[in-house]
């Protein structure tokens, strides 16, 4: 069995003295692991960093085996990204979200989305908006999508500013006014006709509160999980008031202890 594909490095762990098990999110083969001979050495260190894009060749005697990867770096963005304070948290959180997908189950649209996110990840506000949208997309991919296209109470498609915490449906300003304190806020950048250009820190907090509630209830808690420290760190980093000074750059831990 063998195939070639493009992939994004999600994680790496040492295997034996000199090899490493590498986890990729691939375009056509989903989230897939493989053994890289020499992967624990310094030669491949620049390539085997979370967030990098690679071209992968995989082979195994049987399809169900772990198999072996031959990897070639395509877009080695990790070093540049990790000079940005929020990026280490963001890449770690992206990888954790990708691991919610079943192993070896193709999700080409999610792969393309992660590629686009990583290419536009240096700006904190845009990175925050991208991650909220990715969490929303992940809910949909896992079968728990939110209907933000029309008011759940009246069917109108305009002035949607709330979301029901029970149904996950959008609610218009007029219909939601009597229960505004019990509804989640739908930030402008999640509405179909809006972009993230004017997104504020409060908008990002509202977005993460929205997606976080449904991820926790529908996906994480049934698996015995909760929100990660990386997610919390990322939200703090991208919503931090500029007047408070810069956060220190957080490095990704070296999975092979080098």
From Swiss-Prot:
InterPro entries: ARFGAP/RecO, DNA_rep/recomb_RecO_N, NA-bd_OB-fold, RecO, RecO_C. It comes from the Bacteria. Gene3D superfamilies: Nucleic acid-binding proteins, Recombination protein O, C-terminal domain. This is DNA repair protein RecO. It comes from Rhodopseudomonas palustris (strain BisA53). The keyword Cytoplasm does not apply. NCBIfam families: reco. PANTHER family: DNA REPAIR PROTEIN RECO. GO terms for cellular component: bacterial nucleoid. Belongs to the RecO family. Involved in DNA repair and RecF pathway recombination. The lineage of its organism: Bacteria, Pseudomonadati, Pseudomonadota, Alphaproteobacteria, Hyphomicrobiales. GO terms for biological process: DNA recombination; double-strand break repair. It holds the Pfam family RecO_N. Keywords: DNA damage, DNA recombination, DNA repair. Signal peptide: none annotated. The keyword NAD does not apply.
